[in-house]
């Protein structure tokens, strides 16, 4: 063996160097594939992403090929340029060998208790009119009595039922919606947008795939509305009584938690 000049031998240095190179490639390889996928989804070239993230095209090429492992700050800059949500940013961070930056606890977790309290107050204050809490995939996480009555569900169903399933599957809700095509078309458009934002691995994308299996979903207009339209109305008939509604949507400001970013509180107002 030849001396390496620093007290070590070439024979002992080379395996370490090879191991380090393999670790670097492994850490960057998964990230590189994710970045390429997101660029394709956003219709961005490597050059455009480099310009948006203010990084040299050469360095970005090294990151995507696994020849360089980016810092946490660099990953977040790339995520900003790709307009990713907090959950998707965590995925990139982990792929680059960093710890997740943003919380991902469930709706009933301790870390979200203040958000649940705020949402619960809003739902209660909106009684007797319907109001519900949805995630990005349209899962109903919470609802007031007015909404549960409209859906024909009990509180034990919260967290398990999905608004898209209720609207598209044959049953009480679908049969009660007088302008079903208009409402379903809008909800499908909204779900598509969430799936596009969250990516093909998201729960929103899985729900979208399930909804698109309904034959009627293929024939809905890409986006309802027309001249003179302000909001998509909802006409709902139960036991011969017809009611007319429009909705408002509330989100949490300045979220630093993935689910907090995705939550919407939807309130129904009589017309």
Language-model-detected regions and their locations in the chain:
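Alpha-helical residues within the helix-turn-helix
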Residues: 40, 51, 80
């Amino acid at each position: 063996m030849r001396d390496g000049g620093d007290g070590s031998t070439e024979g002992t240095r080379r395996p370490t160097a090879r191991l380090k190179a393999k670790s670097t490639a492994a850490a960057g390889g998964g990230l590189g594939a994710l970045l390429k996928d997101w660029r394709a989804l956003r219709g961005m070239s490597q050059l455009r992403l480099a310009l948006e993230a203010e990084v040299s095209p050469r360095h970005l090429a090294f990151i995507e090929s696994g020849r360089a492992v980016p810092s946490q700050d660099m990953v977040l800059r790339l995520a900003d340029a790709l307009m990713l949500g907090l959950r998707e940013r965590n995925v990139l961070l982990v792929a680059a060998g960093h710890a997740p930056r943003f919380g991902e606890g469930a709706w009933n977790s301790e870390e979200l208790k203040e958000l649940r309290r705020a949402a619960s107050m809003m739902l209660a204050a909106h009684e007797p009119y319907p109001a519900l809490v949805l995630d990005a995939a349209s899962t109903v996480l919470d609802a007031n009595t007015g909404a549960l009555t409209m859906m024909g569900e009990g509180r034990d169903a919260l967290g398990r039922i999905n608004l898209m399933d209720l609207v598209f599957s044959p049953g009480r809700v679908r049969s009660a919606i007088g302008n079903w095509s208009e409402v379903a078309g809008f909800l499908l458009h909204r779900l598509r947008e969430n799936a596009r934002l969250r990516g093909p691995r998201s729960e929103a994308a899985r729900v979208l795939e399930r909804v698109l299996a309904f034959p009627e979903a293929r024939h809905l207009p890409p986006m309802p509305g027309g001249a003179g339209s302000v909001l998509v109305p909802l006409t709902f008939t139960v036991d011969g009584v017809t009611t007319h509604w429009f909705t408002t949507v509330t989100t949490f400001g300045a979220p630093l938690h993935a689910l907090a970013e995705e939550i919407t509180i939807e309130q129904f107002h009589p017309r």
